[in-house]
């Protein structure tokens, strides 16, 4: 006989990328269920003050900051709290490897690959918000998940919507899936207007509030391209079974077309706490403060096909998904370099797609990526190819020396 007064076991939680946009939304939800959780680790990038505030709020066991130059500031902020601190790349990986029942993997870019893999190898639930883990290292990640018996829970609103819309049905019943896109700030812009677009204009997303990198990705539709590749990995689908629809209201987040003709969708307000809460409470549901959707207030929902001429990254993403091998890793790496260059006014907005295309065209081979070292090698290679293109465009690198620069 069990004691009815016994308290349920607290779930052990780790948040990788707690100071980013997904991470802060996650912390907000965790702070609402303090009696149900035990926060093992919070990992941030360079914002020591925010990381310390989060660690105190959640009474975390350890706070880890990637930027080693901010470690002293973090220690000062947490002095006398009993919360341990650590810093640097290896400390971030070790935080990912800590035994936890649920890990939020929200470190963006290639920097998130190693800690996300470490979390998957624990064999528990990983809420995946790091696109690169599946885009660049899909085979490596899925193999680690399978070998450890882990559960991969998609956080991206579109993939989470697909998972909810499937409702437990097997993929043989699925004809295709449809990912939605807001269209970003340039949905109605001409090529000439997009060519002249500034970072300030590109950062004004019409419906979502996100970090700078993902906001620019949304504006270029590189984000949707990455999501097409990620969806193929997550759901085991070929490129021709993944459609994209532009839906400016951002109310419908994803749809599943079943072979019997049924079309099932997931809808909700544009608040990332909704998909995060779904992964946190899965297979149950939790109460959230998110705004409830009032469909009558919208009156009308719009859908249109994306323009893959103006939004070249989406077209290129489909090409690399069909090509396989190292191409997706090069696409992702080149996009990161291009977005950074655009934000720093080194290239124009359309230069993002041009840089990705140039990096892909410059690949002299396209091998399968079987290990993390393979992935990291081609990530670095993609960055070098992209940077070489940007330098050539600005007159800073001659064609005859570019290969030496890439192989340095």
UniProtKB/Swiss-Prot annotation:
InterPro entries: DXP_reductoisomerase, DXP_reductoisomerase_C, DXP_reductoisomerase_N, DXPR_C, DXPR_C_sf, NAD(P)-bd_dom_sf. GO terms for biological process: isopentenyl diphosphate biosynthetic process, methylerythritol 4-phosphate pathway involved in terpenoid biosynthetic process. Pfam families: DXP_redisom_C, DXP_reductoisom, DXPR_C. Pathway: Isoprenoid biosynthesis; isopentenyl diphosphate biosynthesis via DXP pathway; isopentenyl diphosphate from 1-deoxy-D-xylulose 5-phosphate: step 1/6. Signal peptide: none annotated. NADPH binds at residues 19-22, 45, 47, 130, 132, 211. Gene3D superfamilies: 1.10.1740.10, NAD(P)-binding Rossmann-like Domain (3.40.50.720). Keywords: Isoprene biosynthesis, Manganese, Metal-binding, NADP, Oxidoreductase. One of its GO terms (molecular function) is NADPH binding. Mn(2+) binds at residues 156, 158, 227. Belongs to the DXR family. This is 1-deoxy-D-xylulose 5-phosphate reductoisomerase. It comes from Gluconobacter oxydans (strain 621H). The lineage of its organism: Bacteria, Pseudomonadati, Pseudomonadota, Alphaproteobacteria, Acetobacterales. The gene is dxr.
